[in-house]
């Protein structure tokens, strides 16, 4: 069953300033938590389009929200194709778009998907099960230099070189086939004192491989720009991030689109192309409350940012 505790539920949806007859997009359907609350805010004239790459998530939501009929539309697609998929549905602008960039709990908790360092499973980590690149390919085929780069850039792992060396040496004799084998190599690459602090030693490397397999940062950057273009004036974009790399992309994209660039002095009016597209609703990110953190440990790194189209 596709159960998932939704993070920052009301803050994210209420932050969209819902118009009951509006058109909204949930770019990350998952277990349907945000979609459920958003649908409850709509009248019969409103509708919600929900994206997910995961067929199980799509089928689950179709059953769960069948009573909404044509008000609820699912799209099995990566949200990097946001604009194209909406245009295929005849939709050129919307009232609000939300992103929840956390890996949904069912994906983490299903061992055979290979996302979790707590279970021994085949190295997979694909959000879209039809995608060609897997974690197995990354770990066994990518060069030492490529592994160091992703571990450092995407995982912010201090011991990237040591871990990549362990992987390189091991795979000369046999392929690394499971998450369990990978976890042991990561542990070997991290000095013992460092292994005892900062959570599970494999956390950062697993994050890095998952981001690489799914091209997550580039996809998000493209989709966020598309979302800003697709929302109507007065419409909003809500984004929940779970690590500093995603948050940096969101923060800089919102900031760039909400400020006027340096222009030559003495211009009588600001040309339209230089006028800010966005107004920041959250100057600082909204964080989960203490109560939410007690109920859902996975919310601890969540940050919510909201911007409005001018």
Curated annotation (Swiss-Prot):
GO terms for biological process: rRNA base methylation. It is an enzyme of class 2 (transferase). Signal peptide: none annotated. It catalyses: cytidine(1402) in 16S rRNA + S-adenosyl-L-methionine = N(4)-methylcytidine(1402) in 16S rRNA + S-adenosyl-L-homocysteine + H(+). Its main location: cytoplasm. Its EC number is 2.1.1.199. GO terms for molecular function: rRNA (cytosine-N4-)-methyltransferase activity. Keywords: Cytoplasm, Methyltransferase, rRNA processing, S-adenosyl-L-methionine, Transferase. The keyword Cytoplasm applies. One of its GO terms (cellular component) is cytoplasm. It is found in: Cytoplasm. InterPro entries: RsmH, SAM-dep_MeTrfase_MraW_recog, SAM-dependent_MTases_sf. S-adenosyl-L-methionine binds at residues 32-34, 52, 79, 100, 107. Specifically methylates the N4 position of cytidine in position 1402 (C1402) of 16S rRNA. Belongs to the methyltransferase superfamily. RsmH family. PANTHER family: 12S RRNA N4-METHYLCYTIDINE METHYLTRANSFERASE (PTHR11265:SF0), S-ADENOSYL-METHYLTRANSFERASE MRAW (PTHR11265). This is Ribosomal RNA small subunit methyltransferase H. It comes from Bacillus anthracis.
């Amino acid at each position: 069953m596709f159960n998932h505790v939704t993070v920052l539920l009301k803050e994210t949806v209420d932050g969209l300033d819902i118009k009951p007859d509006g058109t909204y997009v949930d770019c990350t359907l998952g277990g349907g938590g945000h979609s459920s609350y958003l649908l409850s805010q709509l009248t019969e004239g409103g509708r919600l389009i929900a994206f997910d790459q995961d067929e199980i998530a799509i089928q689950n939501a179709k059953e769960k929200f069948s009573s909404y009929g044509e008000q609820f539309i699912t799209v099995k697609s990566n949200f990097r194709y946001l604009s194209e998929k909406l245009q295929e549905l005849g939709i050129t602008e919307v009232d609000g778009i939300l992103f929840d960039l956390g890996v949904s709990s069912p994906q983490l908790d299903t061992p055979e998907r290979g996302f979790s360092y707590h279970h021994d499973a085949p190295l997979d980590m694909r959000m879209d099960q039809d995608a060609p690149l897997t974690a197995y390919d990354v770990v066994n085929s990518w060069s030492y230099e490529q592994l160091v780069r992703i571990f450092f850039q995407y995982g912010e792992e201090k011991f990237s070189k040591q871990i990549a060396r362990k992987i390189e040496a091991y795979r000369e004799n046999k392929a690394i086939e499971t998450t369990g084998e990978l976890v042991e190599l990561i542990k070997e690459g991290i000095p013992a004192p460092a292994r005892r602090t900062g959570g599970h030693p494999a956390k950062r490397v697993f994050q890095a491989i998952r981001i690489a397999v799914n091209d997550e940062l580039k996809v998000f950057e493209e989709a966020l720009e598309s979302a800003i273009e697709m929302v109507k004036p007065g419409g909003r974009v809500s984004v929940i991030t779970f690590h500093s790399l995603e948050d940096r992309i969101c923060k800089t994209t919102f900031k760039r689109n909400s400020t006027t660039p340096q222009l030559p002095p003495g211009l009588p009016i600001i040309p339209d192309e230089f006028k800010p597209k966005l107004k920041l609703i959250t100057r600082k990110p909204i964080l989960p409350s203490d109560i939410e953190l007690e109920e859902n440990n996975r919310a601890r790194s969540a940050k919510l940012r909201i911007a409005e189209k001018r």
